[in-house]
């Protein structure tokens, strides 16, 4: 019983005089180096794994210290990091060449280009043939086969096939007679008026002046009956009655 009373008497004293709290030092992050038996693996791996022990309050500072840019505490200036292009060129012995893009022509553009090339080639061939034919006509050949200085396709020999392009021909100087003769009012066969048509025109003018209209006679000359014949489409009498 005495022991219990003494313990109870000591409790209020402890409550009145609490023990002083011991302040613990602030936790500092520590970097754990790899073990001795993993040193060979650490040397072979260019990116080793780093284990860090940090407090929750200082974790952000530790991450920034390990991953952030290096700063000089004395001068307060940032060190310039080397450009990644130079590092890549130093580390690798070759560089990737740029990809050359070829111009893709569309189908209709290629067709137009081909047509233009064919037209140019034909024009060049025609000009060469025309020059050669002119040399033969003006300078070459016997005296009996001399052509007139006035060039005309009709005077050229039929054995020579000369291809002439419209751009190379000078039409005013060629003196070509047009195969189509101009039609005059007297020579027009459609304007020839017969005496019957003249009489009809006078009657037509009189009828139009009197009645205001004129009926032309029908040009059909086939004989016709006065009344058209009606075909029996339906039987008039029943077949039973006829039998």
Curated annotation (Swiss-Prot):
A motif (VQ) lies at residues 59-68. Residues 1-16, 84-98, 191-201 have a biased composition (Polar residues). Keywords: Nucleus, Phosphoprotein. Transmembrane segments: none annotated. The modification Phosphothreonine is found at residues 139, 181, 222. One of its GO terms (cellular component) is nucleus. Residues 1-49, 69-98, 138-162, 180-243 are annotated as: Disordered. Its main location: nucleus. It comes from the Eukaryota. It is found in: Nucleus. Residues 149-162 have a biased composition (Low complexity). InterPro entries: VQ, VQ_4/11/13/19/31/33. PANTHER family: VQ MOTIF-CONTAINING PROTEIN 11-LIKE, VQ MOTIF-CONTAINING PROTEIN 33. May modulate WRKY transcription factor activities. This is VQ motif-containing protein 33. The lineage of its organism: Eukaryota, Viridiplantae, Streptophyta, Embryophyta, Tracheophyta.
């Amino acid at each position: 019983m005495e022991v219990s009373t003494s313990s109870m008497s000591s409790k209020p004293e402890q409550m009145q005089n609490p023990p002083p709290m011991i302040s613990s030092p602030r936790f500092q992050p520590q970097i754990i180096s790899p073990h001795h038996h993993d040193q060979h693996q650490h040397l072979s791996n260019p990116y080793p794994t780093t284990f860090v022990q940090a407090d929750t309050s200082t974790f952000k500072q530790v991450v920034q210290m390990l991953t952030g840019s290096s700063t000089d505490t004395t001068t307060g200036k940032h060190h310039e990091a080397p450009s990644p292009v130079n590092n890549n060129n130093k580390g690798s012995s070759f560089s990737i060449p740029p990809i050359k893009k070829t111009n893709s022509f569309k189908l209709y553009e290629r067709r137009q280009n081909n047509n233009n090339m064919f037209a140019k080639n034909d024009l060049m061939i025609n000009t060469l043939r025309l020059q050669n034919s002119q040399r033969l006509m003006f300078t070459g050949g016997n005296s009996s086969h001399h052509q007139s200085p006035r060039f005309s396709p009709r005077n050229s020999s039929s054995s020579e096939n000369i291809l002439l392009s419209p751009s190379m021909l000078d039409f005013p100087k060629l003196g070509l007679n047009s195969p189509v003769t101009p039609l005059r009012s007297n020579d027009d066969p459609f304007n020839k008026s017969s005496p019957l048509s003249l009489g009809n025109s006078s009657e037509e003018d009189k009828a139009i002046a009197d009645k205001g209209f004129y009926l032309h006679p029908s040009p059909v000359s086939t004989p016709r009956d006065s009344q058209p014949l009606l075909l029996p489409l339906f039987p008039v009498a029943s077949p039973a009655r006829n039998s």
